Amino acid sequence: MVRWKKPKRFLCRKTQDYERIDDIENNDEDSDDDVILEINHDGEHEDNYRNPMIRMAYIPIVIIAVIYSSFIFFFALFIEASAHTNSKCSEAHEKEKMSSGLLTPPMKHILEDRTKYKNEIKLLKTFNVHLTYSTWINSILEILALIYSFLLLLVDRQYLYPLSQVILYLFTRINFVYTDIYGRFFSPSDVVGAITTEVIYDLIRWQSESKLFKVFPFTPCPLPLLLFPIFLSILQVFANQKHTHVYETVLLIFFRIMTRFAGRRPFILSYQVLRSGIASFQSATSHDIAKTLNKVTHCCLNVFASSAFFVLLMVLVDKQGLDKTPKCLAALYAFAMWMQLATVRYRHFIPLILTVVIELVITGLVSYQTGEFIFSHTAEVKDYVFTVMFTIIAVFRFVFIIILFKVLIYKNPPHSLTTTVLLKPTNIPVTFSSIKAPQELDPTNPYYPQTVYNSNQSKNNLLPLTRD
C-alpha cells in the first residue's frame, strides 16, 4: 500500500488551541503516533512577552535609557528574563500535574452555539428594521420643521416665531451634536422646551408696553401657523421615544448574546473593570476572561510608560521645568516602571504596593517643589500649566493602578471553600461525638454521613464502639 508523504506545511499546521507537531526526521516510519498534540497555553497561562502590545511599553523605557542612563533598560530586561523563566517553570509544573492526573486541560467553546440564541438573533433583525424606520422618521420630521420655518421667513411679514424657531433649532442641533448620548436626535425635553419658549415669545408680544420689543418691530404669528410645527414636534417626541426604547432593547440583547470580550478595545475593557470589576464578564468563558484581563494589564502598562514619558517630555520642553521638579524624577519613574512591569509579570501585590509608594513620593516631591517655585517667583498663567497637567496625569495613573489592583484580585483569589482542594476521604472515619451519631457506627464505611476524614490523627481520635 502506497502512502503519500505529508508535506511540511501540514505537519506544522497550527489550529486554535493545538499545534500539530510531527517529527520530520522520522517521516519514513509508517505510524500514526508521530503526530502529537501540544497545548499552546493561552489566556491565564499566556506568555505575555510574545504579545505585541507589550513592546509599546519599552519605547519610553528605551528613550529614557538613552537620555538618562542605560541601566534602566537592562533592569527591565532582567525582569523580563526572570518572568519568562518563572512562566516556563509554572508551565512545567502544570504539565507534571497533568501527567499525574491532578489537572485536566480547560474546556473551551470553539464554535458559538447560534441555535441557543435563535430567537434573540431574529429579534435583533426586527429591531434593526425598526431602528432604520425610526431614523428616517426623525430625519423627515426635522427637515419638515426646518423647511416650514424658512418658508415662513419668505413671507412679507417677518414673524417672531419663525425666526426664533430657526435659532432654537440651530442652537439645539449644535448643542446635541456634542452633548447628546446618541448624537442624532432631539430629546423630548428639548422639544417641549422649544415649544414653551416660542409660546412665551408670542405671549410677551401682546404686551405692547414691553421695553424689550419696542426696538424690534414685528407682527404676531397667527395661531394656525403654530399648529403645524407643534404637531411635528409632538410626532418627533413619540418617534424619538420609540427609537430610544428600541435602541436600549437592542443593547441589552446584544450584551446578553455577546460572550467574547477579546475583540474589544483595551480602554473600554479597562473602564468596565474599573466600574464593575469582573462582574461584567460573567457571561464569558474563563479562557476569554483571562485573555481580556491580560489585555487590560498590557493597557495599564502602556499607560504608565507613556504617561511617565510625557511628564519627562514636559520637563524637557519647559524652560523652567528642571526648577519645578526634583532631579531624581527620571530615576523614580524608571523604578515605578520596573515595579509596574514586575506587577504585570509576576501578578503579585508587593510590586503594586511599591508602585503606589513611588507614585505618592513623586506627587509629593513635584507638588512641593512646584509650589516653592511659584511662591518664590512672580507666577504667570503659563507657570500653572505644568502643575495642572501633572495633576491630571497623576490622577490618571492612580486610576489605572486601581484597575490593575482589581485585575490582581481576580488573578490571585483569596483562599475560600470554592478555591480549596479537598483531598479524597480515607477508610478510617472520625466522629465528632456519639450524641450526634445515635445510630450504630460502621468504621468500615468511609462515606458515613456524620463522619469527617483525617488521615493524620485517625487512630487517636477513633471512638470505641460499644454494643449492647
UniProtKB/Swiss-Prot annotation:
Membrane topology (UniProt): Multi-pass membrane protein
Subcellular location: Membrane
Record-annotated membrane-spanning stretches: 59-79, 135-155, 215-235, 297-317, 348-368, 385-405
Source species, domain of life: Eukaryota
Keywords, ordered alphabetically: Membrane, Transmembrane, Transmembrane helix
Record-level GO cellular component terms: membrane
UniProt protein name: Uncharacterized protein T28D9.4
Naturally occurring in which organism (per UniProt): Caenorhabditis elegans
